[in-house]
Amino acid sequence: MAIYHLTAKTGSRSGGQSARAKADYIQREGKYARDMDEVLHAESGHMPEFVERPADYWDAADLYERANGRLFKEVEFALPVELTLDQQKALASEFAQHLTGAERLPYTLAIHAGGGENPHCHLMISERINDGIERPAAQWFKRYNGKTPEKGGAQKTEALKPKAWLEQTREAWADHANRALERAGHDARIDHRTLEAQGIERLPGVHLGPNVVEMEGRGIRTDRADVALNIDTANAQIIDLQEYREAIDHERNRQSEEIQRHQRVSGADRTAGPEHGDTGRRSPAGHEPDPAGQRGAGGGVAESPAPDRGGMGGAGQRVAGGSRRGEQRRAERPERVAGVALEAMANRDAGFHDAYGGAADRIVALARPDATDNRGRLDLAALGGPMKNDRTLQAIGRQLKAMGCERFDIGVRDATTGQMMNREWSAAEVLQNTPWLKRMNAQGNDVYIRPAEQERHGLVLVDDLSEFDLDDMKAEGREPALVVETSPKNYQAWVKVADAAGGELRGQIARTLASEYDADPASADSRHYGRLAGFTNRKDKHTTRAGYQPWVLLRESKGKTATAGPALVQQAGQQIEQAQRQQEKARRLASLELPERQLSRHRRTALDEYRSEMAGLVKRFGDDLSKCDFIAAQKLASRGRSAEEIGKAMAEASPALAERKPGHEADYIERTVSKVMGLPSVQLARAELARAPAPRQRGMDRGGPDFSM
């Protein structure tokens, strides 16, 4: 969304600055040319006659400007991300003309991409007024001669000096940007005023800047980004608290109206009751209604104790000499209505605190005076404590504890390329680097976890489960050590089968469980990543129309070994031994060296078969296209198709492959085919197919064994 950011700096020779170096930097020229792709647009204006290219002017400023003179004024401002590049160019040029056009001050501007999420503009302005008089470079920067301007240097503007100039510039930028957003049809707006002046109850944000964005993009954690993320989190919770407060006020008003309505209908607001003939008008005794709306009926009025926060506590007032039935009605009906309402509100209170436990404390802590230094800047050290109750940290901590490993592989999948960035961390390092992981997730990347490669463990991942599958697993002694909800009603389970089990055993158990519970077979191996709780699922198919992604939630974290764990390990060992015997048999059969052409004698192409298989599988499994790919490839491989044939068929016929696996389609195909070709059942089927005579092979081709799940 559009954000407001504008800063102004002065570059002077006395301060050690160089105008040429600054111009080279913002235009990515000279020694900065290696990063020239960062510059989306550059332009200059109001340059004097001696200038052939903008660098000449800023070179001359370094050479000829007086020792105590100011070389340039730099204005840096964030461009609205909602605008296209052409719209951003037009906006930056328009604003530059606003600041320089009246006196024709020479300027150079450059728009930087800022990693795609932080587009911004650097504007360098010279204080020398271009009055149209032609002067050489050496004369241009001399002292101005008011009597004979052509003999002196260019006059300096006074407009950039007053302190009011910065406030005027900040306001002008907000006006220009908002007009551009309005012209482009966007509802977003920016405001140059302080949050207090706007009447907004939230913490001021921190501008990251291009260097921080670049470092974070390369996987380098920065304190400034951590602070910005903490503030964003706190502000989101402030908004939640404000909405909750408004909801409570609304509920109280509604319940108050409900109570009054009950009183009017039942007559409980009448002190004498209906048998005394009270019609709601002035009583015969002439008593006026009391402030609480109760009426006297003769005799004195005794105040009952004030109600506590938990309920009404009574009928409000007791009237001496009133009807016993009326008094009983007053004592019961309004109290019952109010009691139910307030009990419901109390339950909502409890639910809110469960969801936002510690949020208010953190917000107050973030806003406290000692969170800033004596210059009003945020103190990084002071912000560590307030986030100790962060719910993402809590979820991560519980997941790490339930997994029970010493070291973990953390994977961050790049949203654009699909490549995985890996980090091997201890549990403490994972928690320490949570702010950086949040930043990566906020930029559209998914966050994953698995035990480190050298870690001795007995965890097996079962992916793509339903609630019914989880219930069946628990009933059959395969209860998970932890359960993660990756998207609404879709779960991953880590099953602990032993304190330590080899990778081959874990892989076999994963395939067994995936087959028994109709889970994702493509994820059934010993090294597959699972989701890390506390972050959002950034896959496009889970994004709502409003642009929201579901949170990855930790549903269970018992960390216990499954009851059937030892039996699963034993069964897997037997299956591995059987597979090894089958592979040995397949090798002996392969030694017969039947012609390869006998394996591939098919009347239909691999592409035809793949499309035919996918048509039935998609009807069966719906949107789970990865499972369809895996089973289709398994069937083709069992019929003798080569890995190359299967890969080509998958590349051409797999539905929406580019949208599902953007940037890593080839890697996905290679991994899927490799897993399929390594299955013992596939190897045995291929060996038997190779041994069979040609007619037998064609018969199997038409019918073929069914390896579907």
From Swiss-Prot:
Q: Which residues form a coiled coil?
A: 567-594
An example of a GO molecular function for this protein is: transferase activity
Q: Which GO terms describe its cellular component?
A: cytoplasm; DNA-directed RNA polymerase complex
| Named cofactor requirement(s) | Mg(2+); Mn(2+); Ca(2+); Ba(2+)
- Name where it mostly resides: cytoplasm
Q: What does this protein do?
A: Part of the relaxosome complex that is responsible for plasmid transfer during conjugation. Locally unwinds DNA and catalyzes the cleavage of one of the DNA strands at oriT. The cleaved strand is then transferred through the dedicated type IV secretion apparatus. MobA remains covalently linked at the 5' end of the strand, and once in the recipient cell, it probably catalyzes the rejoining of the two ends of the strand, re-forming the circular plasmid DNA.
**Name of the protein in its database record:** Mobilization protein A
Source organism per entry reads Escherichia coli
Gene designation:
mobA
